[in-house]
Amino acid sequence: MIESTTSHQDFQQRSMTGYALEHPSYRVRGALFRHQDDGRLLSGTSSNFFHVRSSSKITGCGGDLEVIHALELERSQHTGLPVRVTNVVVFGSNDVVRLIQPIEGTEDVIVNGDYHVSIVQSVELFESSTVSKSRILKLPGKIVAVNAEKHSNTELLLVFLLETGLYHYSFCAQTSDHFQCIQAFRCNRPITSGLLWRDSGLLHVAYYDGFVRVGVVHEQYDDMLLVKRVAVNRNNLSVLLDVVFEEIGRIQKFEDTEKQRREDMLTTSKCLSDKLVSEEEVVEGDTATEDFAKLKVDFKNQSIRCERVSQRLISLRKLITIIKSYMDMNDQIEQMIALLVDQLEELEKLEQLCDEVQKTGNQNLIGKSWIAVEEKRMVVDELIAKVNSDQIKKHSAEWGNKIDQIIDQLNGCSESAKDMRMIISQNIFEHRGDKKDVYTHFVLDSQSRDITLYCLSGLTTLAIYPRKGKRHTSKTTNIRKSQIFRVASISLDASFATCLTAACAMKSAEGVYVADQNAVFPIYFYSEKRYLDAGNQLQIPAFDSISSILIEPHQMILGSVTGGLLHLSFDFASNYEHFVVASSMLAHPISSGAVNCIKLLATGESLLALHCTDAEVVVSEKDQDRWHRVTHHTGGAHSIAVTPFSVDERGSFAVVASDTFVRLKALQYAEESLIGLHDLGESRAEDENGHPIEVLNVSLDPSMQYRQLPCKLRYAVGFSDKAIRTYVALLTGQHDFTVTEKFIAQIEPLFSVQNMICFHGRPMGCYVSCAKTLQIWNDLDRHQQKKLKSERMQLLKLSSSVTSMERTEGFLLVGFADDRLSIYEEKGNGAVDLVGTIENWHTGLNDRSVLGLRTRISKTSCGTRLFIHSLTAHHIVIHTVLVTSSKIEQHDFIVAHEHSMSQPIGFEFVSYKYFEFLVYGRGISNEKLSIEDRKRMDCFRDFEFN
């Protein structure tokens, strides 16, 4: 569609912040963030807690950020045109964005995935860019919560609540290694959800590890500073030694102070215990009990602190010994280098003297001078060999390993795991719920009258808030101002039990919004009455699986699994009704839920995609660079097989596999560009007890084409009862879409039907992989006889498990779990011959199993050229093979293209474009080879004129 904009308007749009002529990718949006300054929207993937500002938006698709300008959102909302975005590549396919939050005191944002975190500068949000890998940190566990604090113009303090504990990192922009772990507490119970926030420098934590716990973390900034100084000066031994001696002096002073403090605490404890024992009645205003409880906390904190200090002292003394030994080694190296410099100077003088003797013509002197020069060169070469010896390189590597071990001991990474409660200096709240009641989200509402912490599960909502105390005036939140807290809770009916995907605090009233995959529920909080009330489900139009929420006064934006953005406007008259007065799609989702399978059909004028999820089967059409839904059928599926699109008949047949049955569908493309998807019927199989058998996969006879009805359709279905059944569907009548099943054969029970592909033939045959075997079967229907057994034409026993299969014109490709791929050639008699095997398929990658094979083939006079593609978690690996006379004549690895889809399921070729692919999973991503990679592929393309 062509927009009617003048060049002046186009220039103004291009100059907008966050504007680019790119279309949004259809990947999961799990984090929505409004930028403070200019109204941009940033989008990421699912998160547990959102910092929402009042003026701008950022969204994240997969491992990237999408920046959408506020005017672009308004334009899309009014015109229905696709949202144009600025794409910032952060994690790519390595991770998915889970949280976007600002860094206080800066215009930058911190972005984290499941295991990675990155600092994204504000200038990178103005145009499409890629975040430097030096600003991406991989953490030792799954990230639960993140907190970032500015310490100086070049330094940040980052705190990560991981599944395995609490970690502090320093980020310094001026060092080559930006990130450095400076303090770590490892816990022995996995933390599944949580939240971090600061108040006046104090770090607060709320988490769930079977218990809901809230407390204040005791941070030792002097210890963090020591680790940082050791890391910075790790290669400057003299300065490092001074740092160590200074720290030992500080520890000795600390020991003297703590000894006296412990004696005072013991004296106080004895007095309090005697007082508590002697008192028969509690005297009003007596604080002995509270003082004794506080003293117990002080004893615990001191014990933990003294234990860490003693371990630090042992590590520092060990470091002194290591430094001294390496200083001696460095002195020896410096002496050798000084000696080498002296010898080089002497060699230079001898060479000058030799040149002067050469001018005299005295052969005797010339000979002696050259002998002296050669002897000196031998001495120099020997010294150079010593300086460059492997021993010195080994010495340098050992120093790096030892200093890393010392740093891990100082920051706590090498310590044994402990109870998380031991690192909390003050326990604020603790709650144990039902074992089935797992708390997945924590939300801190700092905008309400009283600071309130919400702990959310699929069944229960807890609200923790102070009983007394004035509203804190600073921007930070202090939940410790009052030591007494009220707790309100609501347990929903079991029918409401759900798995929450997103949650956020309300703006117009006290409470929270919670969302599962399909709906949004308000939970209102009446703090004065200590009462929580679950409101009615929001009435929203049909939408994708919800993955994120951005709430603003009287409006809401929902993000979905396949890239959708839904805007809702509420009635201003009431803060509690949340009646939706308007809704509009800012970005259309490609489907409802994750894509299980996709098939592309080229119609001549456009490109169609037939894809399925757990909830529906969808037909989408590509208009330039934008995919839009055309029609859909309810009912989920996990596998699709289609006939090639018939340009003459304007249609295609599809076999769609659901859990326990197979549906036949006809896709018709009318002359007036109307696309229809018609249900023709279904087939299923039952066991001896009449229970339906689970369907694993389907495949069509490749000779099948779309024809006018009545016609026949041959297909095979793999079932979970270790059998493959083949069918002929008799499609009768022009408009009466019914299926008559003609049972032909049941293949003998197999060990396991893992991969199945039909091939040409009368009878039709199937390639079947079963663990470490490849079987080839033919159906005996030569004379249209019924219920005859199938015949196994060939059985190949393999050395490794089969992970994928692909059939192309005359060849069968088999991928294995041990990084190999074998090519077989079809012989036309129901058998295949091995052409060759390619070892080390994933060159330079960590992947082993060869998955998701797709092949392009071209036949020339010199042989058959195969371009073989396979999918890994992060790459599309491309090889080329030339087959001549049933042998591999040439094999070359071309490229490993890094795609942007996290946790992909599969991929398909885009018709007529050898450099373009559609990767699918939680959404879809259109991938294109770079110009350099295309040129590399063109080097192997055999051009011939026929």
From Swiss-Prot:
Keywords associated with the record: Coiled coil
Matching entries from InterPro entries are given as:
WD40/YVTN_repeat-like_dom_sf, WD40_repeat_dom_sf
Q: Transcription among the record's keywords?
A: no
Where in this chain does the entry annotate a coiled-coil region? Answer: 326-363
The record ties this protein, via SUPFAM superfamilies, to:
WD40 repeat-like
Give the top-rank taxon of the lineage listed in the UniProt record for this protein. Answer: Eukaryota
- Entry keyword annotation includes ATP-binding: no
| Protein purpose | May have a role in tumor suppression.
This chain belongs to the protein called Protein dct-6
Q: Which organism is it from?
A: Caenorhabditis briggsae
Upper lineage? Eukaryota, Metazoa, Ecdysozoa, Nematoda, Chromadorea
